[in-house]
Amino acid sequence: MSKIQGTLAQWRDRLRRKELSPAELVNLTADAIEADRTTNAYISFDREAALHAAAGADISSPLAGIPIAVKDNINVLGQPTRCASRLLSPYVAPYDATSIRLLKEAGGIPLGRTNMDEFAMGASGENSAYGITRNPEAPDRIPGGSSSGSAAAVASATAIAALGSDTGGSIRQPAGHCGIVGLKPTYGRVSRYGLVAFASSLDQIGPMTRTVEDAAILLQAISGHDRKDSTSANCPVPDFEAALGRDVKGLKVGIPSEYFTSGNHPGISEAVQNTVKQLESLGAELVEVNLPHADAVVAAYYIIACAEASSNLSRFDGVRYGKRAEDAAGLVELFSRTREEGFGPEVKRRIILGTYVLSSGYYDAYYSRAQKVRSLVARDFAEAFSRVDIIVGPTSPAPAPKIGDSALDHLQTYLADIYTIPANLAGLPAMSIPCGTVRESGMELPVGFQMMAPHFREDLLLKTGFALGK
């Protein structure tokens, strides 16, 4: 299979040295996408549109005309945005998301719409109307989700880098399962304008790359204040690449006992502990911290996220855009049949749950309590970060399960995000980097090492991840 090996930084250097043109790189990438018959990482790609953009690419720009894969819930002008759902199958985006506009201004070329769990609801890559995404490292395993296609594309070398979105771990968990780097920025660091919302108070767009350096380059390109997004933070964007060479000596690393438990897969525990020891050998100081509400994060998250989803997805009714049920007898039937025919089972499950917890009889019992837990989780992290610089642990408690296992135990699938959800509830930046493998059924499955930092301190994550990768 044709592959696009090498990092974003390496391809940028090659383009600037004029070893090849942006158009040639677009064709190489498109050829690799067409040759891949295994992962189903892409829903579609537009070679001609990318070649048109490549013709005017500035190789002196930060991204130098490099093609970037884009998750199918981020609007790209003139391209379909389906969110991997039948309901949006006819929709073509009439504008660029702010992250895409900034990507283009930095010299990046959107190429390919990556597969995902429908409307970003899922953690396996199996909940797509366009077929299951497979893990390139083990095709009988899931790649994780919901940014399944973005992770699989980067890991299979059919993309140099990709954009994903993260609501409860949807960048970091698939990054961990596929052995790549995935960074969820601080809530507000990257504009959400043009991202189809799942849970508006939790969603964030971020980079998925092969190296920490590439994550810094791509994050630099898409960060910044945006007046079109009321939740966008109006704060300076630091030089993320400059953070990469900084020393980690004296860095205070928080070790939460709640993340290092006997419930983790033994191989994952060993790989993560080895990475912690590596940090210590680099001069970092290990500090025990407590996150006392860690056992409540999954329940709180699913109440809040589903409540917001039930509201956000009410706009998909067959009236304004997307699929419309035919021959409906009236508006009520139009709405109900459009949604019944268009939404998949997992989306329906979450809409029902969200509507239930927002109903008058259960609002105080569930939604209000979940918001209180969210505040307590944020307070736990604030207290921990008064003593340490970063907090570390496994990205996931277990390696990638086999395809089909998730459908047998939905609760276990939800619990797989227990370590990634807290960063979304607290709005913190978090990054997953590869830290080895575990052997299962004769296969070496990737393990992710997660780091979290205080608000707007992505530089701490990047310098630490870069130091570990040397």
UniProtKB/Swiss-Prot annotation:
One GO term (biological process): translation
Recorded GO MF terms: ATP binding; glutaminyl-tRNA synthase (glutamine-hydrolyzing) activity
Keywords: ATP-binding, Ligase, Nucleotide-binding, Protein biosynthesis
Summary of the function given for this chain in its UniProt record: Allows the formation of correctly charged Gln-tRNA(Gln) through the transamidation of misacylated Glu-tRNA(Gln) in organisms which lack glutaminyl-tRNA synthetase. The reaction takes place in the presence of glutamine and ATP through an activated gamma-phospho-Glu-tRNA(Gln).
Residue numbers annotated as active site: 71 (charge relay system), 146 (charge relay system), 170 (acyl-ester intermediate)
Family the entry assigns: Belongs to the amidase family. GatA subfamily.
HAMAP family: GatA
Complex formation: Heterotrimer of A, B and C subunits.
Origin: domain of life: Bacteria
Source species: Akkermansia muciniphila (strain ATCC BAA-835 / DSM 22959 / JCM 33894 / BCRC 81048 / CCUG 64013 / CIP 107961 / Muc)
Record's catalysed reaction(s): L-glutamyl-tRNA(Gln) + L-glutamine + ATP + H2O = L-glutaminyl-tRNA(Gln) + L-glutamate + ADP + phosphate + H(+)
Protein name as catalogued: Glutamyl-tRNA(Gln) amidotransferase subunit A
